[in-house]
């Protein structure tokens, strides 16, 4: 029956979140998602049994639950990772199942099945929504706004089973207290079901509810109840554990049990949960109306693309976004129409908006399972003002597209392109790929009262492989494709270095190798691969560490070593050192710098701070050490803008995200 009227059920459910439907005489909506980490496979395997049970059972209890519940069912949140893991586990399976944890079956090859195709942790993408899998999932979430969302995971083999709530002191302050109370009440259903089958479990430990970019926490800021399940992992078919032999079927049974207990809780608590969601959005609007300012504005007058990409994220979350009606200067910061956006606070998603834009510096707890800061305009290095007024807002966007670049004006002399635009690297690569010569400005200059900053790209017309007309048409096409403005100039005379000066240096075509494989963090490698491959469309060779000893490194102008983990072998130092001597550019990220320093490729001085506390109780030691870590925080750093690494950044400071305690002393010549 519900399927026959599914549209009207959905419309009524959403109408209630808008305050247009009062009462709880309607179905509850439950989103059940499984195995967003692909190698945590018990969830996805349990989902098939759960789906079968719901489809085949004629039990009165099941039929009553189905009549009162709409279930959004996502059996595999990460099909790429699940496929990698299942292939590995089944390929290495013994006929006589071997529980020895040293067996190859339980030790995946790099990068493992946890991540998706581009090696992203998709359970950190609920807020930024950068991946295609996430975008479809988030669209479904906002189209339905479920009352409960479950997120089925696995944890260490020697654990048991976890369900939320998590550690109380690590719940985000914007999450309502009632949310956690309802989570705990739902937990009694899980406890009862697991008691019945004799499975051990725990709650209110290990995990937190702070970062809203995770599947179990994202619902909490959207009027839903997010619930994390963590099952001890067999990481294959059968494995020894501190609790005895752990089999894959046992892990599946626990996940299935939690899935069923969720539906039972939803059915019995239906009226409570529907009323909670109604009140959540009603309270949101009341809080938004009490704000002393009515809007938020953000943007960057020098880079419309970065501003657009933040607006794009907001709109994927069904947040209303307006254009800026005209150029504005607020608190000394310039906001340009077409490169800035206005967000009204008076909308039902105000709590989510606040979570995205707030800067929080005080916390109840100093320990975090995940990051503690994610202010989105800071992540994009944008100017923003949370105390703006809706009077500066123009029309609301129904759909949003990346701003169109200005037309290229024809020049018989030269063309200039700013390096501040997000897509400038993509445009430059298009130019160099066509074997067109380009140079980079090492100093600022001015032409006809227009200022050009460090890093401006110069494309001279003379001595190119295209005629003047063909070059103009080509650059016009590049500008339209990349949305980067390219300007023609008629003279090389400037205030500053003239265009023929040695302060313009030739840019060579990059040929990039990205080191991947054992000893490299898949997350960091995947982030770089994704950026170059999908955003900038710059070819990149993924060079496995196992190939380094025999690969012809002379093919590459640039080698990137992402963050290392574990032991990154010193055996590769000699060929890389010789390659650097021959003019190669080596880029090392985070603790790859230690490898660079250790192998004398570059002298790096690391700053260390020793812990001087004494008298730490044994039970406190783990938390004491954990409190010294940086799980993810935002810092402001001073920049020396004349350094090529900082070209394209308009200010002499920048906001950076840190998730490590690696600190490097300033260069002695700085």
Task: Report residues per predicted region.
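Intrinsic-disorder/low-complexity accessory segments
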Residues: 1-41, 50-69, 118, 124-125, ...
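Active/ligand-binding-proximal structured segments within catalytic/core domains
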Residues: 46-47
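Carboxylate/His-rich catalytic cores and anion/metal-binding grooves
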Residues: 51-54, 68-91, 96
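Short, solvent-exposed turn/loop segments enriched in Gly/Ser/Thr/Pro and often Arg
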Residues: 75-80, 89, 152-160, 592-593
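Active-site cavity-forming subdomains of large catalytic enzyme subunits
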Residues: 88-106, 127, 131-134, 146, ...
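Aromatic- and acidic-residue-enriched carbohydrate-binding clefts of CAZyme catalytic domains
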Residues: 101-120
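Conserved beta-strand positions
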Residues: 151-152, 561
